């Protein structure tokens, strides 16, 4: 995983599905960004099985080092927004704060999905607050493929 938010979301989804990753010998490790993947893998004991989850624009870094890479398009937030649907996401987020951002000239006329994506990413506090809420609201049958596959394959 690139960051702590990926870990939080994956652990939450696994827990909701009744999985105990620790007892299964699975550890979700945020590496502090895609640039660290080569160094991270080099520091592992030989034979350690590693799966990667990353954003689309950084997949090439993971694929240089790992065979088992799962790519979020364009990123984790995008996967969650699409899986939940715009209306459900709007039920979860602070509509007043989101509406304020929508009034910015750069946001006018942009698709709602892209506005939500931008709004979630524009504040680390907001990002870390809402990603777990979005994952909690997600129907387990609708887990986005990269998240499902990194946990269940």
Role assignments for model-derived ranges:
Residues 1-153:
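Acidic, divalent-metal-binding catalytic cores of TOPRIM
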């Amino acid at each position: 995983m690139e960051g702590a938010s990926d870990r939080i979301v994956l652990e939450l989804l696994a827990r909701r599905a009744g999985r105990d990753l620790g007892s299964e010998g699975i550890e979700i490790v945020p590496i502090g960004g895609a640039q660290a993947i080569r160094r991270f893998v080099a520091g592992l004991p030989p034979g350690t099985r590693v799966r990667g989850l990353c954003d689309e624009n950084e997949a090439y870094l993971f694929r240089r080092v790992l065979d088992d890479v799962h790519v979020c398009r364009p990123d984790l937030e995008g996967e969650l927004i699409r899986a939940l649907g715009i209306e459900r996401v709007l039920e979860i987020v602070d509509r007043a704060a989101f509406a304020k951002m929508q009034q910015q000239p750069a946001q006018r006329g942009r698709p709602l999905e892209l506005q939500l994506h931008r709004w979630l990413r524009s504040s680390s506090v907001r990002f870390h607050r809402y990603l777990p809420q979005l994952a909690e609201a997600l129907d387990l049958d609708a887990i986005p493929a990269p998240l499902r596959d990194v946990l269940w394959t």
